[in-house]
């Protein structure tokens, strides 16, 4: 239990730091004492693009590009065995596993198992994938940097079953 609290505190601190940095950058474009608020019922799931995902996944976009805030975020729900294709984020990404068990990997290396509370930080330009484990759903929250040219991700080839199943022990 204490370990879970430590992980939760770490995740909260990381998110606070990330969004505090964004807040400083956004101070000029967002009026003081105001915020954008979205009720949960206004958020909707959309099927993940089958051209860049293997298996069934859904995306809940939580924010679009906001002037002065160089990130966007969302929740991705991966069904068992579902995963992204290999991809690169020109301005980086981090994600937190909220539920289930998943896998993530960097091209040329063995994949890692990720569990609730784990945080994965993908610096700009790192070719990687993420998705659910073979027998369990995974839900993750992503925060992705917005590249000045407007492209948050470059999609590449499909992750093979061999790459997906090669796990770091």
Describe the predicted segments one by one:
Residues 2-12:
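Bacterial N-terminal signal peptides that target proteins for export
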Residues 11-21:
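Bacterial N-terminal signal peptides
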Residues 24-70, 152-169:
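A short, N-terminal "cap"/entry segment at the start of jelly-roll beta-barrel domains
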Residues 108-125:
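Short acidic-glycine-tyrosine-enriched beta hairpin
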Residues 73, 135-154:
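A short hydrophobic beta-strand segment most commonly corresponding to one strand
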Residues 86, 104-105, 127-133:
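Short beta-strand His + acidic residue motifs that chelate non-heme Fe in jelly-roll/DSBH
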Residues 75-79, 88-104, 143-146:
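Short, conserved beta-strand element in jelly-roll/cupin
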């Amino acid at each position: 239990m204490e370990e879970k609290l430590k992980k939760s505190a770490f995740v909260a601190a990381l998110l606070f730091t990330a969004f505090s940095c964004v807040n400083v950058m956004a101070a000029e474009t967002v009026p003081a004492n105001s915020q954008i608020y979205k009720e949960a019922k206004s958020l909707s799931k959309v099927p993940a693009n089958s051209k860049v995902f293997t298996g069934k996944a859904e995306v809940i976009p939580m924010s679009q590009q906001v002037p002065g805030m160089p990130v966007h975020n969302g929740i991705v729900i991966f069904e068992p065995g579902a995963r992204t294709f290999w991809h690169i984020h020109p301005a980086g990404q981090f994600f937190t596993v909220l539920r289930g068990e998943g896998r993530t990997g960097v091209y040329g290396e063995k994949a890692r198992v990720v569990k609730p509370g784990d945080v994965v930080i993908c610096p700009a330009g790192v070719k990687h994938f993420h998705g659910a484990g073979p027998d369990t759903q995974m839900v993750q929250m992503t925060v992705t940097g917005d590249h000045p040219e407007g492209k948050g991700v470059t999609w590449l080839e499909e992750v093979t079953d061999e790459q997906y199943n090669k796990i770091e022990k």
